[in-house]
Amino acid sequence: MLGRPKLVLASGSPRRLALLNQAGIEPDALRPADVDETPIRGELPRACANRLARAKAEAALQSIQLDDDLRGSYLLAADTVVAVGRRILPKAELTDEASQCLRLLSGRNHRVYTAVCLVTPKEAFRQRLVETRVRFKRLSEEDIAGYVGSGEWRGKAGGYAVQGIAGSFVVKLVGSYTNVVGLPLYETISLLGGEGFPIRHGWLNAG
């Protein structure tokens, strides 16, 4: 679209990019933000997701302010946190971490929080937090070993990717499925449209 304002996605996540593409939105640039995602001691899951999404947006904003082509763009950042009660699970990088996450999730309810932070061309910050409740079946040691062997969990909040093999572990999901994938699509599109970003599809009137 000629004259469409630019959109920068402050993420290197293929899943978040694919979800935006699914909604007919193609970011003009990707600016993954390098922030420390370690939870603060005693930090609650909601607060952690909100803080990290904001931190990613602020870091990416500093980057695009130095780029003549991207300065004044819309900027979208997000962070996903998986928690059992108040316990925040790691974004697993090691097999032991993944195994521990899966044992903790086995047969239990957990919550997935994704905070979305939008920075407008006038550098106003707008934020939404979406919560989804998920219940896993009871996982056998064979289930856990097989999934860990797949490698799908690497870098994923809570040590699993719901859009892959782990989707077969889900007994019940209440709320946004795309939130569990990494970007709550309805809320994200509503946020963009509500701040004046042109949404291509007519199926959503983001007022």
From Swiss-Prot:
What is one Gene Ontology biological process annotated in the Swiss-Prot or TrEMBL record? nucleotide metabolic process
This protein's cofactor list reads:
a divalent metal cation
Family matches, as InterPro entries: ITPase-like_fam, Maf-like
Q: Which UniProt keywords apply?
A: Cytoplasm, Hydrolase, Nucleotide metabolism
Query: Per the UniProt record, which EC number(s) apply here?
Result: 3.6.1.9
Q: Which parts of the sequence are marked as the site Important for substrate specificity?
A: R15, T80, Q163
Query: Residues in the active site?
Result: D79 (proton acceptor)
Q: What class of enzyme is it?
A: hydrolase
Its family remark reads:
Belongs to the Maf family. YhdE subfamily.
Query: What's the protein called, per UniProt?
Result: dTTP/UTP pyrophosphatase
Task: Tell me the organism.
Answer: Rhodopseudomonas palustris (strain ATCC BAA-98 / CGA009)
